[in-house]
Amino acid sequence: MVATYGIHWFRQDLRLQENPSLLSLSKKVDQIIPIYIFDLNQRIGSTSKWWLEKSLISLYDSIQKHNGKLNIFAGDPEKIISSILKNSNVKYVSWNRLYDPYSIKRDTKIKSIVTSSKIECDSHNGYLLNEPWNIKNKSGTFFKVFTPYWRHCDCLLYTSDAADESVR
């Protein structure tokens, strides 16, 4: 039987535990290829670089304990992921969503590249209790006042549908 491979793209979620994208991918493939791409289009400060270095070392060690290897790249994520897809037999690509405008635009392009290659692509909420576009008032519009928003979100915390499988 031929093994199925999937790429998990680590970004700001440099952890193996409680990682919904990684959990979902592990149920679909025989082997996960973990990657991290230092996006040269994004500038980060010295404190963030220090945190990133320590976190990548920790993640690298954690993956190594599971007989894996974290593949680290620097450059344009679109080009790097395209190159990996051309040179491998990957069936799935996954990551946890980021919500800043740059990441949304980049991720949309990458998802298009992946799916046009006939490869399944999944992104997951790995940061927030609720997706921003899912929290609306009774009128179907977004909340403008915090207290009603908080009351609505507080109720959602205790429903089984709101809890992600990876944290149950």
Task: Describe the residue ranges of each PLM region.
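Trp/Phe/Arg-rich N-terminal binding region typifying the photolyase-homology
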Residues: 1-156
